[in-house]
Amino acid sequence: MSRVCDITGQGKSFGNKVSHSNRKTKRTYLVNLHNVTLLSDILNRKFKFKVSSRTLRTIDYKGGFDLYLLNTSSRKLTDKAQKIKKLVKNAVAKGVKVSL
């Protein structure tokens, strides 16, 4: 299992551990991932994801999973999230109401 966010693709990053004497040693920073089920109100479906805490906070801030997908550019999303975004866009085009 890779430690990558299923929505944004955010993975581990690299940096330095700096000691008191200012010596630097390489280290990795892992992403804080959670297994969550997100509900799409427009599609009336549930989706299971492995999502980072940062992405969860952003989804709450944007007003829900559907609004997050609609208001986020496709190049910031993974392929899996882009497919769901396309489904949501098609449902909105057919006349399903988007509630805030």
From Swiss-Prot:
Alphabetical list of InterPro entries matching this protein: Ribosomal_bL28, Ribosomal_bL28/bL31-like_sf, Ribosomal_bL28_bact-type, Ribosomal_bL28_sf
UniProt KW keywords: Ribonucleoprotein, Ribosomal protein
Cellular component terms (Gene Ontology): cytosolic large ribosomal subunit
One Pfam family this sequence matches: Ribosomal_L28
GO biological process, one term: translation
Molecular function, one GO term: structural constituent of ribosome
Coiled coil: none
Biased composition (Polar residues): 10-19
Region (Disordered): 1-21
UniProt-listed PANTHER family: 39S RIBOSOMAL PROTEIN L28, MITOCHONDRIAL, LARGE RIBOSOMAL SUBUNIT PROTEIN BL28M
Family (UniProt): Belongs to the bacterial ribosomal protein bL28 family.
Protein name: Large ribosomal subunit protein bL28
Species assigned in the record: Ehrlichia canis (strain Jake)
Lineage start: Bacteria, Pseudomonadati, Pseudomonadota, Alphaproteobacteria, Rickettsiales
Gene: rpmB
